[in-house]
Amino acid sequence: MKVAGFTFIRNAVKNDYPVVESITSILSLCDEFIVALGKSDDETEQLIKNINSPKIKIIYTEWDKSLKNGGSVFAVETDKAFAAISPDADWAFYIQGDECVHEKYLPLIKKEMEDNLADKNIEGLLFKYMHFYGSYDYYCESRRWYRREIRIIRNNKNIHSYRDAQGFRWNDRKIKVKLIDAYIYHYGWVKPPKGLVNKGYNFNQFYAENGHPTDPPPATDEFDYGNADRMLRFKDTHPAVMQKRIDAVNWNLDVNKIEKNKKMSARRRFLQVVEDLTGWRVGEYKNYEIVKQ
């Protein structure tokens, strides 16, 4: 069984993405790892090279800044990395620059790839998600945030990244997947308040038709945490590769203030109760077809 990892990244230093931690968290499972490196204004290239692994292959790309519809440029860059994977790879393990896998899940993930290799009805493996929010000490649960997504796919070029690279499709249909008992830890919203404000501003250029607003970046250090429907204390351990970042944290999160400012409607509160009692997320968007779990 041959496994290829792949990701895309641009301006990782400027945007404080833990891309080195992301790559190294799954590198031991991979025989090769493709990094689609977009033209950057910082030291991202050296950051990747400093991982110093013969498994890593960098392909240099230029982001199409005319693609401003719903983050579609992220899917285009993902597809560039996927296309560069060696044709003899069986599985392709995708990870984004703000995601990590805890080392405790690696044996299970490897076994799932081995056990499902011969089952052609399984086109991908579906992971559970934990979204850390504002701090490494808290994670967020919300109906507006995806709780599962495909991160391992067959190395079949009929597959392509979908929408803003959240998931994948086989041509135009949903991929048939097995849900596995492993989590992706998503750290994209773990930043000091000013960093979160800047992230929202920078992301706008890839989701809004007109790109960046004409106004300068917001001067405020206050971030609106109102979309955190429920913040829960994280009582487990983080991936070992993340520990250095966690030790360097220099801000405090006022969870009590966030609780007071929550903007959870009565309808969402009711639907959350239904999910808590039954496990059923009413109206959940599913960019996949679960055929095995």
PLM-predicted stretches and their roles:
Residues 71-79, 100-293:
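Catalytic-site signature of metal-activated, phosphate-bearing donor transferases
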Residues 2-7, 26, 32-35, 184:
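Hydrophobic targeting segments
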